């Protein structure tokens, strides 16, 4: 999804920086984005919402001061708490009004998320400017309905977008990013 957002921004003549937080040593997504000539800043060795918050702050500060960017795309690792990301972003000069928080929900695993990661859903979905239900091409009608139920449990009015990431309409991505 991050790659698709970068492509849409690039097609719209927007300059974007991409920050990816990888827990492992090698970022597979990062390699793909670099092959497509996107500049990617990688933050390794932990979660940017807690142990690497200073690294995030420094990276964003560097991007804002040294590059003429329209947008910074940020992909935290795994189940990072998005509320913990706001403070380092604000300290680096990014305003809360400029942050677009997009939550992506996998409908194939929504039951597991609700059973195991309920506190994460409870803190993440209310902060989201939009929620994307991904993999609609392989999810059952029941899984999609459950996904909407879970989203609405935590936010009654967040916009929900249903997509197949392999065949997503660029117009939908633009609406989400401009939202």
Provide a role label for each language-model segment.
Residues 71-162:
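Phosphate/Mg2+-binding loops and adjacent switch elements
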Residues 66, 137-139, 167:
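Short, exposed beta-strand "edge-strand" segments with a Pro/Gly-rich flavor and a Y/T-containing core
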Residues 1-113:
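Nucleotide-state-sensitive switch-loop elements of NTP-binding domains
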Residues 14, 114-118, 170:
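Short, structured coil/loop segments at alpha-helix boundaries
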Residues 7-10, 126, 152, 177:
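Alpha-helix boundary recognition
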Residues 154, 158-179:
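Long, charged, low-complexity intrinsically disordered regions
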Residues 21-23, 136, 165:
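Short, ordered loop/turn segments at secondary-structure junctions
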